């Protein structure tokens, strides 16, 4: 199954992808807009193969780079079997989430809602209210609270994603982890370290 990972910047999309894959595929930083390429993670377990498109966060583009990144998100939503919408625990749905949900509706897109950063919530009631709000907005195939930070909920999320895999064949060889060349991954990891050292986006 082709899975598009979508959501606003800095909700933990890349961290979730890295958790699901079990190793670093996508660059992770607190700086906005660090994911520039549609990095693909390929997870093969027996008959299941999940191909992940990790998209840049949705935002209103101010630059030509920003426009390219938003176009990349739109393309990801268009060509996948299922979308995983990642939102931050305790945060109200905003324009980004509502726009993506409208896209899901227009395409009748199977979608899974991953509520990340549940480790930051003090009250469980906040989470229950958030799940109820999103359930009114769209008929998600599953809603899974997770923490990419400590790994909570990742097995449940993977189970739900596997259900989307269906009977389709494998797109990649079983030992493939990403379609990004190794030198690109190395460059991304170096860029992540630079971003952590610098106060502003490179």
Where would I find each of the regions flagged by the language model?
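Conserved G1/Walker A P-loop phosphate-binding module
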Residues: 1-82, 87
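Active-site phosphate-binding and catalytic loops of NTP-dependent enzymes
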Residues: 26-28, 169-173, 196-202
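Conserved nucleotide-binding/hydrolysis micro-motifs of P-loop NTPases
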Residues: 32-34, 56-59, 89-93, 118-121, ...
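Conserved C-terminal guanine-recognition region of P-loop GTPase G domains, centered on the G4
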Residues: 44-49, 68-143
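Canonical P-loop GTPase G-domain recognition
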Residues: 109-112, 119-182
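P-loop NTP-binding site
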Residues: 184-202
């Amino acid at each position: 199954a082709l899975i598009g990972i979508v959501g606003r910047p800095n909700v933990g999309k890349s961290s979730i992808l890295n958790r699901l894959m079990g190793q670093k595929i996508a660059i992770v930083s607190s700086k906005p807009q660090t994911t520039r390429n549609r990095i693909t993670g390929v997870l093969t377990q027996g008959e299941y193969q999940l191909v992940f498109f990790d998209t840049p966060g949705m935002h209103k583009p101010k630059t030509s780079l920003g426009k390219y990144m938003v176009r990349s998100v739109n393309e990801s939503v268009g060509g996948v079997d299922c979308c995983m919408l990642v939102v931050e625990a305790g945060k109200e749905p905003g324009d980004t989430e509502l726009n993506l949900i409208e896209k899901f509706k227009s395409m009748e897109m199977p979608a899974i809602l991953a509520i990340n950063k549940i480790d930051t919530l003090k009250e469980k009631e906040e989470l229950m209210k958030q799940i109820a709000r999103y359930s009114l907005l769209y008929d998600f195939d599953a809603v899974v609270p997770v923490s990419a930070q400590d790994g909570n909920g990742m097995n449940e999320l993977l189970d739900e994603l596997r259900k989307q895999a269906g009977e389709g064949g494998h797109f990649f060889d079983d030992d493939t982890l990403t379609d990004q060349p190794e030198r690109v991954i190395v460059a991304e990891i170096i860029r992540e370290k630079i971003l952590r050292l610098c106060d502003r986006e490179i």
